[in-house]
Amino acid sequence: MKILVQKFGGTSVASQEARIAVKDKVQKAVRSGFAPVVVVSAMGRKGEPYATDTLIKVLKETNLSVNVRELDMMMCCGEIMAACV
């Protein structure tokens, strides 16, 4: 079985309709005999609630002394949320 890497950016997972389209593309790859590896970005664009830039801004506004570990954790939150939904 061939591996197919599918990358979906923020707007590709920003809405329920867009996520359904992503699901359909992944399922089509499976039906075509591929083993998909799906990579997703955080949902939306800068300024939207779950976009990486927005999450980092919230962290920096509430904590002026952000350490690297906290920043790394916040930076992956949007992608984790997108992968879950």
Identify the meaning behind each predicted range.
Residues 1-85:
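Nucleotide/pyrophosphate-binding catalytic subdomain
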